[in-house]
Amino acid sequence: MALTKAEMSEYLFDKLGLSKRDAKELVELFFEEIRRALENGEQVKLSGFGNFDLRDKNQRPGRNPKTGEDIPITARRVVTFRPGQKLKSRVENASPKEE
């Protein structure tokens, strides 16, 4: 099961007493700010959680798995996430939930 933006909004509604509309807008604005920063080439550091970084990947040779034909894989920029130590520790020590 995955945590969704709708579930995050519902949590803010329940815990902070925000209106459903304000809770949804807060979640949307939070993620929009992360997107904006990454689009502008900035690193995003969330203390106690982790860092979103941009990494430029060079062009490299590849192969079409169906035909075996050599094809170039174009250079591109990718987003990476590195979890912080606090997040790593909490995940390692968490009890797995049954689905």
UniProtKB/Swiss-Prot annotation:
Region Disordered: start-end pairs: 49-75
Pfam families: Bac_DNA_binding (PF00216)
Covalent S-S links between cysteines: none
SMART domains from the UniProt entry: BHL
GO biological processes: DNA recombination; positive regulation of metabolic process; regulation of DNA-templated transcription; regulation of translation
GO CC field: cytosol
GO molecular function, one term: structural constituent of chromatin
Keyword line: DNA recombination, DNA-binding, Transcription, Transcription regulation, Translation regulation
Protein family (similarity comment): Belongs to the bacterial histone-like protein family.
PANTHER family linked to this entry: DNA-BINDING PROTEIN HU, INTEGRATION HOST FACTOR SUBUNIT ALPHA
Subunit structure, as described in the record: Heterodimer of an alpha and a beta chain.
Function: This protein is one of the two subunits of integration host factor, a specific DNA-binding protein that functions in genetic recombination as well as in transcriptional and translational control.
Name by which UniProt lists this protein: Integration host factor subunit alpha
Gene for this chain: ihfA
